[in-house]
């Protein structure tokens, strides 16, 4: 299949950079893409930065409409926010896409002992390392984003061996794999994207973990709809507004005294998320910030 590489180059003030990147990513997500490649913003003036987000569009009968929608949404973003967007389009085939995409990801050490290894990279494990082998396909990253890295750190810090773990919006399955390798007895994941469910299952198998039965399960569902049990540790690396929507029902799947780890939150929306979680019976016990991204650890009140 032929693909069209669509890049949105954005320029904004440095304090708005992460928010701008999230807004640009959302354009691609709203068009139905399951994942994008994000390039870190670089300074272009005393207070200005330039970044780029890349998505890959299939060359099919819907391409012209998708391209027009992309241009319209980028223009609308520039009109509503202090962001100037420029679009770039480059044709490529499957092989070009695979090479370009893989060049963005490397072996990464996260937390104390977690190592995320893209399957196309070599790595000799050191004693004590927890190595996660990932091949996320076209749809997902490999833990390099600050929100994923912070979630991994919190799972490593707070997961007790033998406990039950649930990941909401599991994506590549990276948090499920980490939890199982860190000693969780039960590992479940849920995602509303069928591509995510497939890729997560493949990544689990790549790490010697097989979904099926109560010990390890991946479900396609909207948030925690269909989850019929409670867990000791629940993660949700999703957008701020989705966490707020999740909060009304998430207490049902967290045991009393259990923990909820939320990431994907930008600093301007932190107070909104914390207020909602508190109103829904959670105490915020830990906060971590990287760049403008926030990760919260909340305990369900007994």
From Swiss-Prot:
Residues bound to S-adenosyl-L-methionine: 148, 169, 191, 237
Function, as annotated: Methylates ribosomal protein L11.
Entry's Gene Ontology molecular function annotations: protein-lysine N-methyltransferase activity
GO biological process per UniProt: methylation
Encoding gene (name): prmA
Organism encoding this protein: Desulfosudis oleivorans (strain DSM 6200 / JCM 39069 / Hxd3) (Desulfococcus oleovorans)
Family, per entry: Belongs to the methyltransferase superfamily. PrmA family.
EC numbers: 2.1.1.-
Annotated disulfide bonds: none
Gene Ontology terms: cellular component: cytoplasm
Location(s), subcellular: Cytoplasm
Enzyme class: transferase
Name recorded for this polypeptide: Ribosomal protein L11 methyltransferase
Catalytic function, reaction form: L-lysyl-[protein] + 3 S-adenosyl-L-methionine = N(6),N(6),N(6)-trimethyl-L-lysyl-[protein] + 3 S-adenosyl-L-homocysteine + 3 H(+)
Pfam families, sorted: PrmA (PF06325)
Record keywords: Cytoplasm, Methyltransferase, S-adenosyl-L-methionine, Transferase
